[in-house]
């Protein structure tokens, strides 16, 4: 189990390192490439699907469903940050809502170590979304 935990954390770290190396104009395409490579789902499909549909698509990965959901949530958060920077507030809100739904669905299946990382992220997303909806 510890190897599995390390793998998720390492994958997220590698994704962030890969995104950091890209110039700002290349990041949206980089996120799309990472999304397809790491989760098997095209980012455009994800962005235009409900969280329930995304979770159904992730179930096809069997035992990797929760890890892929966490990776996808991370990518959606990165994409939401880019959308904010580009003035696309609606897209950013939708991306964060999708990320929150994926984390909410997966959080109890994660190890205590992973939960320690992702519960604060989920709480921050939820808080931001509640603030926006007021």
PLM regions and their residue ranges:
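N-terminal alpha-helical interaction modules that lie
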Residues: 1-69, 104-105, 128-134
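Start-of-helix signal in alpha-solenoid helical-repeat scaffolds, especially tetratricopeptide repeats
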Residues: 5-10, 66-74, 93, 97, ...
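Residue-level signature for tetratricopeptide repeat
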Residues: 18-22, 75, 82-85, 89, ...
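Specific register positions within alpha-helical solenoid repeats of the TPR/Sel1-like families, i.e.
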Residues: 24, 77, 84, 103-104, ...
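Residues in the short coil linking paired helices within alpha-helical repeat scaffolds
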Residues: 24-28, 88, 95
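Glycine-rich, aromatic-bearing surface loops/beta-hairpins
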Residues: 104, 109-134
